[in-house]
Swiss-Prot record:
Keywords: Carbohydrate metabolism, Cytoplasm, Hydrolase, Magnesium, Metal-binding
Organism, as annotated: Aliivibrio fischeri (strain ATCC 700601 / ES114) (Vibrio fischeri)
SUPFAM superfamilies, A to Z: Carbohydrate phosphatase
Name listed for the protein in its UniProt record: Fructose-1,6-bisphosphatase class 1
This protein's pathway: Carbohydrate biosynthesis; gluconeogenesis
Catalytic activity, as annotated: beta-D-fructose 1,6-bisphosphate + H2O = beta-D-fructose 6-phosphate + phosphate
Cofactors (names): Mg(2+)
Compartmental location: Cytoplasm
Quaternary structure and partners: Homotetramer.
GO BP annotations listed: fructose 1,6-bisphosphate metabolic process; fructose 6-phosphate metabolic process; fructose metabolic process; gluconeogenesis; sucrose biosynthetic process
Pfam families: FBPase, FBPase_C
Positions contributing to substrate binding: D118, G119, S120, S121, N211, Y244, Y262, L263, Y264, K274
Length: 336
């Protein structure tokens, strides 16, 4: 039996990857790990206690907040503030960025952006959900409160990114720019154990993930790509398989392991796309590039986009490199 390596042990062993971090980044990831355990425990009680369903509030995008959205947001925010490595957070569930005002927090080097509970509307039907996080070094002077500019950095400035998937097992997957590593939660020990080291996505795949119910509203290039996916060409391993869970973390995780592409294009209802650049697209783009894949908005690399606002939306195409390139070819051919 191979030796079990916990997330904490792995982070310590990889400390040399952060020559300027002095341990703060490792401790910060430890804060995320702690909050993930708390949220995981609560999710596992869904259906037994009154934590599912709508909270009665809306977020800044006008979307109905679920009770667990609010719960997860509060737990991650509290855990990050308590460790003093973070000067502020921005969340999909918060209208504005939150600057932590304790003196120790003002002296912290990092800001965190997060989607505390992606796919939360799936909770009450027992479908996998997740947490997505992104970490940047602040650009405002240390010793002062965090500013909005600390959060409006292009994705290639991220120092770490990852997600937690709460599914049949709970996994934390993260990168610090030195490979993508996955840790599975052992509830009997209360620790995350290394289960997937140096994860790599296949260059090609035969899975495509998109909400085909919106087909009539898609750009022509996407419609033509979907026809290509469904065409019978055994020599090209087509038709491809359609798999869409409706939870970005779950769809992304499957495609990362098996090879595939996730697509959320612009539509008539969402001409700029629906997914948020800062909370969803940037962290997933960093992960996929570290795993050998590709992420774009249909025109440019996601990680090169300079954000203009906290809740900015973009079209999103992420997955196996050859599949993303094929989507680009269709978009270019059928561009208006």
């Amino acid at each position: 039996m191979s030796e079990i390596r916990t997330l904490g042990e792995f982070i310590v062993a990889k400390q040399h990857d952060f020559p300027h971090a002095s341990g703060e980044l490792s401790s910060l990831i430890g804060s995320i790990k702690l909050a993930a355990k708390i949220v995981n425990r609560e999710i596992n009680k869904a259906g037994l206690v009154d934590i599912t369903g709508a909270s009665g509030e809306e977020n800044i995008q006008g979307e109905q907040q679920q009770k667990l959205d609010v719960y997860a947001n509060d737990k991650f925010k509290s855990a990050l503030e308590a460790r003093d490595q973070v000067c502020g957070v921005a969340s999909e569930e918060e209208d504005e960025a939150v600057a932590f005002n304790k003196e120790l927090n003002k002296n912290a080097k990092y800001v965190v952006l997060m989607d505390p509970l992606d796919g939360s509307s799936n909770i009450d039907v027992n479908v996998s959900v997740g947490t997505i996080f992104s970490i940047y070094r602040r650009i405002s002077p240390i010793g002062t409160p965090a500013t909005e500019e600390d959060f409006l950095q292009p994705g290639h400035k991220q120092v770490a990114a990852g997600y937690i998937i709460y599914g049949s097992s709970t996994m934390l997957v993260y990168t610090t720019g030195n490979g993508v590593h996955g840790f599975t939660y052992d509830p009997s020990l209360g620790v995350f154990c290394l289960s997937h080291e140096n994860m790599q996505i296949p260059k090609d795949g035969n899975i495509y993930s998109i909400n085909e119910g919106n087909y009539i509203r898609f750009p022509e290039g996407i419609k033509q790509y979907l026809k290509f996916c469904q065409e019978s060409k055994p020599e090209d391993n087509r038709p491809y398989t359609s798999r869409y869970i409706g939870s970005l973390v779950a769809d992304f995780h499957r495609n990362l392991l098996k090879g595939g592409i996730y697509l959320y294009p612009s539509t008539q209802a969402y001409p700029n796309g629906k997914l948020r650049l800062l909370y969803e697209c940037n962290p997933m783009a960093m992960l996929i590039e570290e795993a050998g894949g590709k992420a774009t908005d249909g025109e440019q690399r996601i990680l090169d986009i300079k954000p203009s606002e906290l809740h900015q939306r973009v079209p999103f195409f992420v997955g196996s490199t050859n599949m993303v390139n094929k989507v680009h070819a269709f978009l270019d051919e059928w561009r208006d």
